[in-house]
């Protein structure tokens, strides 16, 4: 019974973790700039973002992006060009609205996954709050009086960090797999079109040869007559 409870709590924790970490998917239309925003309630919050271009026509996955701080909406604090995927964290020195803007060029539409969020709590405070929540859910006593429980809590914190790394790796491989699949489909389409053009060219050349031969034989008969 205790093993079933442990498995239940692990499953609940994993489901909650991945539900909170799900990114936003949006369409980046050609020739247009798309901006998304996050509002920080105080200064010195850790702002993090992760994005990956999932689809792009003609193998065009490159986008330009800028990040603007609340104090200056005209001058970006971060600016990158020709990126397919990006991830970074920085300290927001100002309270207010931060914006991340994408531009995919004038040639093709693109599909982008984005995770743009902030965290104003220190990691130690976050771990303590999570531990308190777990204790409240399971009616556990203080871990300071139980070395085994303290060891279990430390193991859970380690699992949380490893899950965060795993989530990022999954997003990276998902993006790479999507781009590779799109590249394969695009290459397959080009091969099919090239084959069709080749067949039509052969048929056209055969018809032209037949017409030329008929014209030559017709002219030779006229001369013989």
Swiss-Prot record:
**According to the UniProt entry, which residue ranges have a biased composition of type Basic residues?**
129-138
Q: Name one GO cellular component term.
A: membrane
Transmembrane segment boundaries: 196-216
Which domain of life does the protein's organism represent?
Eukaryota
Q: What is its main location?
A: endoplasmic reticulum
A biological process term (GO) from this entry: vesicle-mediated transport
Which parts of this chain are annotated as the region Disordered? 129-149
Q: Topological domains (Cytoplasmic): residue ranges?
A: 217-225
Q: Where in the cell is it found?
A: Endoplasmic reticulum membrane
Q: Where is the secretion signal located?
A: 1-23
Task: Name the UniProt key words of this record, in alphabetical order.
Answer: Endoplasmic reticulum, ER-Golgi transport, Membrane, Protein transport, Signal, Transmembrane, Transmembrane helix, Transport
Please report the stretch or stretches of sequence annotated as the GOLD domain. 33-172
Question: Does this UniProt record's set of keywords contain Endoplasmic reticulum?
Answer: yes
The residue spans the entry assigns to the Lumenal side of the membrane are as follows 24-195
Bilayer topology? Single-pass type I membrane protein
Family label: Belongs to the EMP24/GP25L family.
Q: What else is known?
A: Present with 3190 molecules/cell in log phase SD medium.
Report the protein's function. Involved in vesicular protein trafficking.
The protein's name in its UniProt record: Protein ERP3
Q: Which organism is it from?
A: Saccharomyces cerevisiae (strain ATCC 204508 / S288c)
């Amino acid at each position: 019974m205790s093993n079933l409870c442990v498995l239940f709590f692990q499953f609940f924790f994993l489901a909650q973790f991945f539900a909170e970490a799900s990114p936003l998917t949006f369409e980046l239309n050609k020739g247009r700039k798309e901006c998304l925003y996050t509002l920080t309630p105080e200064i010195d919050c850790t702002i993090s973002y992760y994005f990956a271009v999932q689809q792009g026509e003609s193998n065009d996955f490159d986008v330009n992006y800028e990040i603007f701080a609340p104090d200056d909406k005209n001058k970006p604090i971060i600016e990158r060009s020709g990126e397919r995927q990006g991830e970074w964290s920085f300290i927001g020195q100002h309270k207010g609205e931060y914006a991340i803007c994408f531009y995919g060029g004038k040639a093709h539409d693109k599909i982008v996954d984005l995770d743009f969020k902030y965290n104003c709590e220190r990691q130690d405070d976050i771990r303590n709050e999570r531990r308190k929540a777990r204790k409240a859910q399971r009616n556990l006593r203080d871990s300071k009086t139980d070395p085994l429980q303290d060891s279990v809590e430390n193991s859970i914190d380690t699992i949380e960090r490893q899950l965060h790394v795993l989530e990022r790796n999954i997003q990276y491989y998902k993006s790479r797999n999507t781009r590779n699949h799109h590249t394969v489909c695009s290459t397959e389409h080009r091969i099919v079109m090239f084959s069709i053009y080749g067949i039509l060219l052969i048929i056209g050349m055969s018809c032209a040869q037949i017409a030329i031969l008929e014209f030559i034989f017709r002219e030779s008969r006229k001369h013989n007559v």
